[in-house]
């Protein structure tokens, strides 16, 4: 999947952006998972900043009840008996099972685009009932990338086409070359 999406990430560490993330994380369980975000980005092709943004959204910046009592940063399978051994385990499960094998895998029914999205496209079609879930997660992503100098913002144009009869254009313009 990593090669399929041709992901190349320019953000390589949490301290790329002054102390913003450090200030947020020192009071949350997200700090314990720092290395896991990058390890599983490289292992499974799931963007670390995207996973962190989603974890911030789903776990109240790593301070939610599920984060503290279950090491669960994403709210997945949050049953009384279900607990991750560590926050890294939560990131592993999210990167492998939810992103790489489902929501970011074009051959799976959950795939509607490799972005947070809304109810028309992206992960939010199947992931969350809140129609604004994608906007909330994307806001965390945008704020962190902006604080790091907008190194990922508008850097890539990715597309996955399963039908060979679809025209692909260089720009979002009627006059663009195919």
What does each model-found stretch correspond to?
Residues 58:
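Pyridoxal 5′-phosphate
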Residues 1-50, 61-178:
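Catalytic cores of secreted/periplasmic lytic hydrolases that degrade extracellular macromolecules
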Residues 53:
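C-type cytochrome heme c attachment motif
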């Amino acid at each position: 999947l990593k090669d399929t999406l041709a992901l190349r990430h320019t953000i390589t560490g949490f301290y790329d952006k002054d102390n913003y993330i450090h200030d947020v994380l020192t009071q949350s369980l997200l700090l314990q998972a720092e290395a896991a975000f990058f390890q599983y980005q490289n292992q499974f092709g799931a963007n670390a900043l995207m996973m962190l943004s989603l974890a911030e959204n789903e776990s109240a910046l790593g301070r939610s009840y599920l984060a503290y009592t279950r090491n669960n940063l994403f709210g997945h399978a949050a049953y009384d008996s279900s607990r991750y051994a560590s926050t890294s385990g939560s990131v592993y499960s999210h990167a492998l099972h939810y992103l790489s094998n489902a929501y970011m895998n074009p051959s799976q029914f959950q795939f509607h685009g490799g972005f947070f999205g809304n109810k028309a496209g992206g992960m939010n079609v199947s992931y969350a009932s809140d129609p604004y879930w994608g906007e909330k997660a994307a806001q965390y992503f945008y704020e962190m990338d902006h604080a790091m100098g907008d190194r990922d913002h508008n850097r890539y144009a990715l597309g996955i086409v399963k039908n060979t009869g679809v025209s692909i254009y260089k720009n979002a313009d009627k006059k663009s070359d195919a």
